[in-house]
């Protein structure tokens, strides 16, 4: 596992965006051989999306031959709702870059057959071979996507009941009213994430410090689903300074020295 220790949320977003752009450009995608990118929602990736849009407008990257798969979507929330992940992605990213509409894949939380929707999503991912890079965030309790504590580390795309803590955390997007936050969501599984060629998780804020410690210094444990990254051959965790407060000094020093060349120029 790589740990990229940075100072601020802005630096985390810039590093993540630069990493994605470098991966896309090195891949040299075409219509017949697209780059497949997994994407998250929420507050954490906003600085990364902003930086990606800026790099696109500066001519540094094209998304014309990029195919995206989003991590999750609420169940029962109309896609036109301002807090649906469909709306979030278009508002913060898709509407500002040159990605073709047919290359965008989002789970449908209003599908008449939820099980079929989840199966078809997995099959569509497999039809591209694999996701080349999956970017994600992490919850205070260590969940990735909506794989809440005690999720199977072999899980695939499915419906999940959201914990009360997750709904409280997300209520900030629903006028602070937890009762407006949907109780269920569709989410890719831990196994789906582990199938990606590379997984990059962004971690921001002191409230995520225990989750980061569990990921880096703890054991693989389904109560902290972020710890599954230890099983992945190409995992990258990009974090700001407040989120490192639970890490041992020697751990942080080790990764600072290891990644010194890779955190320049931010």
From Swiss-Prot:
Its EC number is 3.5.99.6. The active site is at residues 72, 141, 143, 148. The keyword Hydrolase applies. It comes from the Bacteria. GO terms for cellular component: cytoplasm. It catalyses: alpha-D-glucosamine 6-phosphate + H2O = beta-D-fructose 6-phosphate + NH4(+). The record marks 151, 158, 160-161, 254 as: Part of the allosteric site. One of its GO terms (molecular function) is identical protein binding. Pathway: Amino-sugar metabolism; N-acetylneuraminate degradation; D-fructose 6-phosphate from N-acetylneuraminate: step 5/5. Allosterically activated by N-acetylglucosamine 6-phosphate (GlcNAc6P). HAMAP family: GlcN6P_deamin. NCBIfam families: nagB, PRK00443.1-5. Homohexamer. This is Glucosamine-6-phosphate deaminase. It comes from Citrobacter koseri (strain ATCC BAA-895 / CDC 4225-83 / SGSC4696). The lineage of its organism: Bacteria, Pseudomonadati, Pseudomonadota, Gammaproteobacteria, Enterobacterales.
């Amino acid at each position: 596992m790589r740990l990229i220790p940075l100072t601020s949320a802005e630096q985390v977003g810039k590093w993540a965006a630069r990493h994605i752009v470098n991966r896309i450009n090195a891949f040299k995608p075409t219509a017949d051989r697209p780059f497949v990118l997994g994407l998250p929602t929420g507050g954490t990736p906003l600085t990364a999306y902003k930086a990606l849009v800026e790099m696109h407008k500066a001519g540094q990257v094209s998304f014309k031959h990029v195919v995206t798969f989003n991590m999750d979507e609420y169940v029962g929330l109309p896609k036109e709702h301002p807090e649906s992940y469909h709306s979030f992605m278009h508002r913060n990213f898709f509407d500002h870059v040159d990605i073709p509409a047919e290359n965008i894949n989002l789970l449908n939380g209003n599908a008449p057959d939820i099980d079929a929707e989840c199966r078809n999503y997995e099959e569509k991912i497999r039809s591209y071979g694999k996701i080349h890079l999956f970017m994600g965030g992490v919850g205070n309790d260590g969940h990735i996507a909506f794989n809440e504590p005690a999720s199977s580390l072999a899980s695939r795309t499915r419906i999940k009941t959201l914990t009360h803590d997750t709904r409280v955390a997300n209520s900030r997007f629903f006028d602070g009213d937890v009762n407006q936050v949907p109780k269920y969501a569709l989410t890719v599984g831990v196994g789906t994430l582990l199938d990606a060629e590379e997984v990059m998780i962004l971690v921001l804020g002191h409230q995520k410090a225990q989750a980061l410690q569990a990921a880096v210094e703890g054991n693989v444990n389904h109560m902290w689903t972020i710890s599954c990254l230890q099983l992945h051959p190409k995992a990258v965790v990009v974090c700001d300074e407040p989120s490192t407060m639970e890490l041992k000094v020697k751990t942080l020093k080790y990764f600072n020295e290891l990644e010194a060349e890779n955190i320049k120029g931010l």
